[in-house]
């Protein structure tokens, strides 16, 4: 994925490369990948990337209001396509990677990972789950997908009062890492 992402940024930034740097609005989920490839991009091109991380929905709003980003790396295609439809983008929206929704658990969690969320449902009933962190479904695509998955598993009503909402995936991850949420 890193090579694909590096190539995507390289070709996307060709129009702004004369400036010596490109300003990138990137979904928080891309922090580790972009932190790794940014120095490689600079070494290969002589140009730097100035990366801001956050939720895709907030970046959409900022760009709509005139924020000077050269590249928008969203966690989904919805927000970039809106910018294209509103004639606020200079290029078509293109997918650059495919993400996966996961249930993040601390190493010593009493919850058991499973693809059906059956243990999460059991944890709701037996009291093992008091706080569940998700990204804000209004502005973060992974938050939206988490809400959809919980609704599909008929767990949304049960987890809703236990939610700890992060502004983006990075913040939701920090809630779990710090112990503020069990999952």
Positions of predicted regions on the chain:
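Sec-dependent N-terminal signal peptides
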Residues: 4-13
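Sec/Tat signal peptide C-region and signal peptidase I cleavage site
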Residues: 15-19
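N-terminal segment of the mature folded domain
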Residues: 20-133, 138-139
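Ligand-binding cleft/hinge of the Venus flytrap
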Residues: 38-44, 118-166, 173-180
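Glutamine-centric residue-chemistry signal
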Residues: 62, 171-174
């Amino acid at each position: 994925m890193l090579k694909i992402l590096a190539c995507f940024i390289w070709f996307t930034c060709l129009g702004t490369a004369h400036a010596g740097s490109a300003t990138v609005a990137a979904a928080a989920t891309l922090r580790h990948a972009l932190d790794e490839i940014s120095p490689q991009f600079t070494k290969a091109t002589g140009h730097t990337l100035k990366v801001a991380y956050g939720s895709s929905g907030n970046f959409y709003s900022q760009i709509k209001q005139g924020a000077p980003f050269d590249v928008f790396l969203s966690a989904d295609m919805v927000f970039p396509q809106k910018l294209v439809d509103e004639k606020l983008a200079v290029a078509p929206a293109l997918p650059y990677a495919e993400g996966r929704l996961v249930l993040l658990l601390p190493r010593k969690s009493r919850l058991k990972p499973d693809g059906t969320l059956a243990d999460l449902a059991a944890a709701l009933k037996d009291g093992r789950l008091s706080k569940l962190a998700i990204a804000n479904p209004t502005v973060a695509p992974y938050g939206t997908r988490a809400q959809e998955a919980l609704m599909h598993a008929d767990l949304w009503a049960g987890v809703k009062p236990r939610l700890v909402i992060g502004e983006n995936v990075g913040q939701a991850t920090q809630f779990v890492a710090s112990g503020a949420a069990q999952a």
